[in-house]
Regions:
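Cytosolic Rossmann-like ligand/nucleotide-binding regulatory domains
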Residues: 338-400
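Extended boundary segments
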Residues: 316-352
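ATP-dependent carboxylate activation and anion-phosphoryl transfer catalytic cores
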Residues: 24, 246-324
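ATP-binding N-terminal substructure of ATP-dependent carboxylate-amine bond-forming enzymes
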Residues: 2-7, 12-110
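Short acidic-glycine loop/turn motifs at beta-strand connectors
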Residues: 214-218, 274-276, 365-366
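Active-site nucleotide/adenylate-binding loops and adjacent lid/helix of ATP-dependent enzymes
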Residues: 20-31, 36-43, 52, 76-78, ...
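Phosphate-binding site of ATP-dependent enzymes
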Residues: 171-262
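Short, compositionally biased
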Residues: 102-104, 375-376, 394-420
Length: 422
């Protein structure tokens, strides 16, 4: 345990010197203590008199049981106020388990376990973004090389981008100009056990993108990255060039929403500049700091540390578990497009026999309307999100949603509810 008199058990440093009264106990989870980003975070934490240490996640162990959960470092309990995860792709599974354990202990973690898991799976991230009307390049997930021809047609034809669902710093991303090459590459990637995506190629954004750093829902810095030579990937890691830019409101709004929807307090959002506006290419939960600090002159590391200092003591809550903890209760959603009979109806008409508020949100055009009144009128494209007793919600909705799309005589057994975690 760390305290102001003895900080030897976990090795966390007293940045303020002997006798300094403890402020924030901070751990940076990283396997690369000499990497630029890790060193900068450590430096800025020490400037602010934090107790701080870089901890190798592969040297930490987890104890789970009926007693209080624990995280051990060389046999000593790790007791901190805030954690900044810098988890590499190769140890995502263990890293996410560690973060989940810190969350159980009530420790603030800069990026939640769910946020990291979602962002590391490109397909899952794309599904979450598009569900909330965040613009992305058209993307197809394929399971066999025979699916390539159909995928090419759906994303707009050649050339296309072929990528693996999990990867970082531009690895596993290929620009392909012929169908034969796309089929050959897909076969190779699938045979290696990868999940493969075929993605629309945005010609007007060839070799460049915009990296936006979002911390706590605020835009901290933005830069344009350009590839060198014949390379089409613009990653700084791949020797691309960077320049500071002033971000437009449209691009800033998309970046903020993408980070928020993936539940990331610290995110690097990559945007393509297309003829139809900003497109989210990827959301990174461990964005590199060297390129962005060099291009903009902004102390991004300092902003991250100050954010953690402010939020230490407040842990992330798994809302899905909370909503399911009450027996018989849960979340039910209904899409108006699938049940057009609800179009033009008021919420009070649908739930006429329920006095309490059952509909806690309506998703409309990428936004959420919270706690809508009973007089709120539904329209096409809306999604009703309800919370309460599952059986009671189903009972109220059944007479309405039994009129399914293309089958107005559908029986209750064909009703389609979607029970989800929000």
């Amino acid at each position: 345990m760390i305290n102001s008199e003895d900080n030897t058990s976990t090795g966390l440093k007293n940045g303020g010197g002997p006798g300094y009264i403890m402020t924030v106990r901070l751990a940076i989870l990283s396997r690369g203590p000499r990497l630029y980003s890790t060193r900068r975070l450590l430096e800025e934490a020490e400037k602010r008199d934090c107790y701080v240490e870089v901890l190798d996640p592969m040297r930490l162990s987890i104890t789970v049981g009926n007693d209080e959960p624990r995280i051990l470092n060389a046999g000593w309990p790790v007791e901190v106020d805030a954690v900044i995860p810098r988890i590499g792709y190769s140890i995502t599974h263990h890293g996410v388990a560690l973060i989940r354990q810190f969350e159980r202990l009530g420790v603030y973690v800069a990026n939640s376990s769910d946020g990291i898991s979602h962002s590391r799976d490109k397909l899952h991230a794309t599904q979450l973004l598009t569900k909330n009307r965040i613009p992305v390049p058209t993307t197809c997930h394929i399971r066999t090389w025979q699916d390539v021809e159909g995928a090419l047609s759906r994303v707009g034809g050649m050339p296309v981008v072929v990528k693996v669902s999990e990867g970082t710093q531009g690895s596993g991303v290929f620009l392909v100009h012929s169908e034969d090459r796309a089929r050959e590459l897909t076969y190779k990637l699938l045979s290696e056990g990868n999940h493969v995506l075929v993605q629309e190629y945005i010609e007007e954004s060839h070799g460049r993108d915009i990296r936006v750093i979002v911390v706590g829902g605020k835009i901290v810095a933005a830069m344009r990255r350009r590839a060198r030579g014949r390379e089409f990937r613009s990653n700084f890691h791949l020797n691309g060039t960077v320049e500071n830019i002033d971000l437009s409101d449209e691009y800033a709004n998309v970046a903020r929403r993408a980070a928020r929807l993936l539940n990331l307090d610290v995110a690097g959002v990559d945007l393509l500049e297309s003829n139809r506006g900003p497109l989210v290419l990827e959301v990174n939960s461990s964005p590199g700091l060297e390129g962005i600090e060099g291009a903009t002159g902004i102390n991004v590391a300092g902003v991250i540390i100050e954010h953690c200092m402010i939020h230490q003591g407040f842990s992330n809550v798994g809302l899905d578990q909370l909503l399911r903890s009450r027996p018989g209760h849960g979340v039910v959603s209904v899409n108006i497009n699938r049940h057009p009979i609800l179009n033009g109806k008021q919420i009070g008409d649908v739930f006429a026999e329920v006095n309490e508020q059952v509909v806690f949100a309506v998703a409309r055009e990428g936004m959420h309307i919270w706690k809508p009144r009973r007089t709120f009128m539904l329209r096409r494209g809306d999604e009703i999100i309800c919370y309460g007793e599952i059986d009671k919600i189903h009972q109220q909705l059944t007479p309405w949603v039994s009129h399914s799309v293309g089958n107005n005589n559908a029986s209750p057994s064909t009703i389609e509810f979607s029970e989800e975690s929000y």
